[in-house]
Amino acid sequence: MATYMANAKTVSPRWLLVNAEGKTLGRLASRIAAILRGKHKAEFTPHVDAGDFVVVINVDKLKITGNKTQDKQYHHHSGYPGGLKTINFADLQAKKPQRILELAIKGMLPKGPLGRQLYRKLKIYAGDQHPHQAQQPELIDL
């Protein structure tokens, strides 16, 4: 018997809703990355997008352990000399709380065309409101 290989026609994605209130950043990000990948399904195939859509709400209430609130820093570079920009966790959470979870999950996805396709299935919102009620996402507890 041949090994089963999923393809785009045989995979049917679901919409899942995750409430991030009080959850730890890294643990939540790794579970969401696995769901985006489709690793929780029996028909998981490494080179196929078999994952589900994930809507995350309340990311402004994420937890982080230790002193990382002040010590953890995020860097990006403009490409010009002296263009390194640095911001710590507390400041980034005040300005763009959804960016923290985006960066954590994006680092856990494959680098390449498949990873970019999976990343587009992730929807993150700071409050408890989201515009995806029409898709009827089912609430899961991670």
From Swiss-Prot:
Coiled coil: none annotated. CDD domains: Ribosomal_L13. Keywords: Ribonucleoprotein, Ribosomal protein. The keyword Ribosomal protein applies. Signal peptide: none annotated. InterPro entries: Ribosomal_uL13, Ribosomal_uL13_bac-type, Ribosomal_uL13_CS, Ribosomal_uL13_sf. PROSITE patterns: RIBOSOMAL_L13. It comes from the Bacteria. The keyword NADP does not apply. GO terms for biological process: negative regulation of translation; translation. Transmembrane segments: none annotated. GO terms for molecular function: mRNA binding; structural constituent of ribosome. It holds the Pfam family Ribosomal_L13. Part of the 50S ribosomal subunit. HAMAP family: Ribosomal_uL13 (MF_01366). This protein is one of the early assembly proteins of the 50S ribosomal subunit, although it is not seen to bind rRNA by itself. It is important during the early stages of 50S assembly. This is Large ribosomal subunit protein uL13.
